[in-house]
Regions:
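Nucleotidyltransferase catalytic core that binds NTPs
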Residues: 1-161
Length: 161
């Protein structure tokens, strides 16, 4: 299900907590969804009962990645993620970091890619303080949205990566 604002997910979070279900949270741009994203999201969902994915708004992606990004508008990125059987909820954030969402939802598990070093994961101290878990999932080698875009722009076939 797509929640236009993360605050709309709060009643569902209360229901999950009351039912004793474990909530997993991750976030990212998810522009040009690729197999690396799929592997990470599927592994994230396996860590709990429900997975919520917070995606950067278009303005947030532009501020991080530059004026030519995102390639895919936020509504379409959300629709694609929502169609995945291992993603239970999708929401958006326009702030530079997802800290406000993390502290409000208090996920049981916070997931990021293994490229995020110790102390670099936004929300890690907070999640650990309330007894949650922070998991860094190994990245599938060879996948990067930026690399895919560069290959397309240079005319290099993706098969020759």
């Amino acid at each position: 299900m797509i929640y236009p604002t993360w605050r709309e997910f709060l009643p569902e979070r209360q229901r999950l907590r009351a039912a004793g279900l474990k909530l997993v949270f991750t976030n990212g741009c998810y522009d040009l969804l690729h197999p690396g994203h799929l592997k990470t999201l599927e592994a994230s969902r396996a860590l709990g009962d429900r997975l919520i994915v917070a995606i950067n708004t278009d303005a947030g992606v532009r501020s991080m990645k530059g004026p030519d990004r995102p390639i895919t508008p936020e509504a379409e990125r959300a629709e694609v993620l929502d169609a995945l059987e291992f993603v239970d909820a999708v929401t958006f954030f326009g702030e530079p970091t997802p800290l406000a969402i993390i502290t409000a939802l208090r996920p049981d598990v916070l997931v990021k890619g293994a490229d995020w070093g110790a102390g670099a994961v936004v929300g890690e101290p907070e999640v650990l303080a309330w007894g949650g878990e922070v998991v860094r999932i190994p990245l599938a080698p060879g996948y990067s949205t930026s690399a895919i875009i560069a290959a397309i722009q240079s005319g290099t076939p993706l098969s020759s990566r």
